[in-house]
């Protein structure tokens, strides 16, 4: 039923537009994890009769408030009314039989309730506004980890963040536990289902994967499956280059030496994987963030596991237009690290391929951003791997629409070579690469298949400056 409202100004924040405009080459981290299962809805209800029953127009899980205005709490559940019917069904009712306070017969009142999220809640979504993330996926909490990770990533400066909220509500599909008390088996099924969505995303929608979990057992190898996914998608045939970042479970009671050895062993375990350069392990395993309770308004520090640190690293990597910019010695904000390692412990972990976050003064920084592949600078440095993938992605953008489907003439070969050289010159200007060997650039027709154009060239990426060695000698007297 419609209702009257007096003339006036009623401010309301609108949701962020669904279409997100990003620059060509923007890199997007995707956060995968648990979020809210219900959302708030407010309806205007007309009271049928005193002591009677009024049906809600939609399925509802619980009542938030009932009042004469949309933001008022006036009528109290069990004292003034009962909430009856089958949970999450369209036959939920406000039953005024307790004979407490109630609206007059024929009067309108407002019911705010929580209803199950729509089915598209579990699809891929991209956001640039953390308030919109909270509205859709729920407030930050230990159960809404997808919100925590996405907000942290945006706070580090990434242009946008992708979210896939795992679906734990389809209880018939899970071995045990269900949505209220999910087990490792339930999480494994839910995270595995999310891989089906990730396989449909292109590189401009998904660059870095951050599953908000540390579960990776032999029985439930969530993170191992995600690394295999990153490897498969990064094959030349798939053309969707990806990296996985993970943390470890929070172990606040463990000693530094125990945690050091665990991180070292974890990074070493990825060393032999074909996609080791696409695996980033971040330490420490516990971080804290101050979160305000939406109901009480009280702010408190909450401890999270290393997946939150992984989300922060992903957000910082994707924050720069230039993929050559490393996260080494960059500042991180919006959370704090709970564990402080000695330099000796950090050296041991870094020597095994762990990216460590530490305090320099009062500022949290990444000590050295590295992958688990220590073969050489081209595989160890996160920024160099990012350059590699950036060149691949931009090569498609530069060449595919312009040349694929053209007649394969000598003029086309010359034009392709000119485009490649111009593209690489731009990369030098943008400081993505340091140089390339122009004499090595060749564009030829494949000898075995006349439809294939082969391009080859030698490129020198822009390496990060990590060490400065200073040597000097003292001398006595006026001259050396």
Spans of model-derived segments:
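Surface-exposed assembly/interface segments
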Residues: 1-480
């Amino acid at each position: 039923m419609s209702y009257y409202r007096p003339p006036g100004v009623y401010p309301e924040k609108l949701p962020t537009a669904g279409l997100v405009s990003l620059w060509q080459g923007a890199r997007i981290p995707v956060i995968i994890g648990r979020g809210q299962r219900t959302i708030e809805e407010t309806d205007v209800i007309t009271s049928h009769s005193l002591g009677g029953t009024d049906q809600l127009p939609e399925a509802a899980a619980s009542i938030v408030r009932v009042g004469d205005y949309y933001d008022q709490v006036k009528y109290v559940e069990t004292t003034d009314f009962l909430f009856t019917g089958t949970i999450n069904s369209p036959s939920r009712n406000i039953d005024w039989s307790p004979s407490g306070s109630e609206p007059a017969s024929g009067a309108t009142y407002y019911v705010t309730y929580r209803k199950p999220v729509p089915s598209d809640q579990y699809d891929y979504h991209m956001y640039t506004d953390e308030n919109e993330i909270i509205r859709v996926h729920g407030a930050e909490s230990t159960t809404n980890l997808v919100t925590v990770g996405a907000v942290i990533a945006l706070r580090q400066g990434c242009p946008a963040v992708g979210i896939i909220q795992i679906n734990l509500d389809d209880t018939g599909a899970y071995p045990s536990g269900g949505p209220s008390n999910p087990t490792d088996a339930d999480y494994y099924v839910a995270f595995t289902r999310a891989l089906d969505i990730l396989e449909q995303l292109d590189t401009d929608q998904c660059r870095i994967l951050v599953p908000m979990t540390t579960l990776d057992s032999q029985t439930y190898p969530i993170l191992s499956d995600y690394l295999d996914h990153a490897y498969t998608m990064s094959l030349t045939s798939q053309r969707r280059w990806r990296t996985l970042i993970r943390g470890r479970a929070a172990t606040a009671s463990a000693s530094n030496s125990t945690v050091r050895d665990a991180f070292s062993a974890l990074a070493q375990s990825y060393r032999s994987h074909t996609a080791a350069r696409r695996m980033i392990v971040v330490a420490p395993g516990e971080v804290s963030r101050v979160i305000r309770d939406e109901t009480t308004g009280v702010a408190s520090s909450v401890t999270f596991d290393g997946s939150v640190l992984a989300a922060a690293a992903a957000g910082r990597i994707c924050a720069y237009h230039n993929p050559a910019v490393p996260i080494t010695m960059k500042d991180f904000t919006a959370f704090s690290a709970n564990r402080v390692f000695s330099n000796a412990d950090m050296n041991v972990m870094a020597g095994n391929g762990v990216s460590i976050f530490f305090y320099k003064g009062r500022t949290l920084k990444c000590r050295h951003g590295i992958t688990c592949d220590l073969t050489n600078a081209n595989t160890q440095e996160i920024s160099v791997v990012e350059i590699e993938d950036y060149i691949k992605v931009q090569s498609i953008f530069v060449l595919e629409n312009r040349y694929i489907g053209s007649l394969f003439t000598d003029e086309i070969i010359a034009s392709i070579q000119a485009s490649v050289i111009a593209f690489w010159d731009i990369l030098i200007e943008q400081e993505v690469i340091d140089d390339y060997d122009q004499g090595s650039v060749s564009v030829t027709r494949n000898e075995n298949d006349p439809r294939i154009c082969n391009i080859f060239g030698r490129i020198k990426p822009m390496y990060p400056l990590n060490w400065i060695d200073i040597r000097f000698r003292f001398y006595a007297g006026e001259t050396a």
